[in-house]
Amino acid sequence: RQSPASGGFGISSSALGGVAAGGLIGLLLGQKKVRKMAGGAIGYGGAAALGALAFRAYQNWQNGQQVGQATTATVADVPQEGSRFAPVNGADGRPFALALIQSMIAAAHADGHIGAEEQKQIFEAANRGGLDAEDKAFIFDALHNPLSPDQIAALAGNQEQATELYLAARVAIDPDQPDEKAFLQHLARWLNLADDLVSHLEAQVRQNL
């Protein structure tokens, strides 16, 4: 995981745009994680930035593009709310942005823990971000009881949501440790993602983040 100084879980006021849960995703992404995508994704909130990257990777995969020549996501790829890459709810009936947060937190736990300072930053952002008491409790539970890959996969109602849940986990960490790599591999299998689709998602991460 990246340190706050390098943009991993560090709080950035410019990353806290959009709806409350989407803004918390912006926090988890960190300023560096969202500002590079076409120069304007921050204004849409963190969930929309993830949706744009997932949409572009999915389209490139469906169109049979080679990973090395794949089209890079732009702000034009930010999905409309309620579309398949910006769903209102996940398979559990709760806001899909909360499922993305659960996936990100679970990935951050893959190396064994989230540090006390990181937890404090997330708590503070949730408290001032406009989340209601139920949603805050939901996020706090995710911090203390992170989901397993199969539990994350159960939150996906379709392949597009599965794609986005994987991407959320991937951008939350720099998978340079065996535990992190294993987590992503297990998650991809539970989400039933094709290997070449995963490669396209990785390409969007490299190109945009």
Regions found by a protein language model. Give the residues of each.
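Acidic, glycine-anchored loop motifs typical of Ca2+
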Residues: 112
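Primarily EF-hand calcium-binding motifs
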Residues: 105-107
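Small-residue-enriched hydrophobic alpha-helices in membranes
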Residues: 1-102, 119-209
